[in-house]
Amino acid sequence: MKKPLLLLLCLFTVIGYAKDPHIKAGYALIERVTPGYGKQIKLQLIDPANGEDVYEISSEKGKVLLKGNNAIALSTAFNQYLKYTCNAHVSWLGNQLNFPENLPLPQKTIRNTINGKYRVYMNYCTVSYTAAYWDWERWQREIDFMAMNSINMPLATVGLEAVWYNTLLKHRFTDE
């Protein structure tokens, strides 16, 4: 009786991880950056380290094992794996992703916490001069770049003009 219950519990755990939004987001990013390689990588959620984001890079049963406490940590682990195990690079303007059909396995387990609760990115010049001309593909690349570099708080200027407007009204400026 205990064995079937244990098997059922394991099955629900596996199904739960497969449906977890952090895991799904991680695999989606991996497929966008390195199409077809996602099947060689296993993603797993772990608890934060003293309230900080954390990730681990290792291998398990012939697969690359990336662990993180959320989608950003998993994406950071993927980026660090690409850089330091595959000698690959993802940047704003292009990628250097020359690696073999079978991904190399990490030789040792790496565990890092990600510094800072909030990791801010972008500035008003980027938003005003550059991003205004981006299409969805370019935005997706930028969002992936942010996730792979631990960014969890991009500049959001949406609605800022309303704050400025109301502030000026409070200081007796008029619409004229």
Regions found by a protein language model. Give the residues of each.
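Bacterial Sec-dependent N-terminal signal peptides
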Residues: 1-21
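Feature activates predominantly on carbohydrate-active enzymes
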Residues: 29, 35, 46-50, 60-176
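Short N-terminal segments immediately surrounding and downstream of signal-peptide cleavage
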Residues: 20-36
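Short hydrophobic "helix-edge" motifs at membrane interfaces and signal-peptide entry regions
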Residues: 4-5, 59-61
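A short, Trp-centered hydrophobic/proline-enriched beta-strand micro-motif
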Residues: 39-43
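Extreme N-terminal leader/anchor segments
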Residues: 52-56
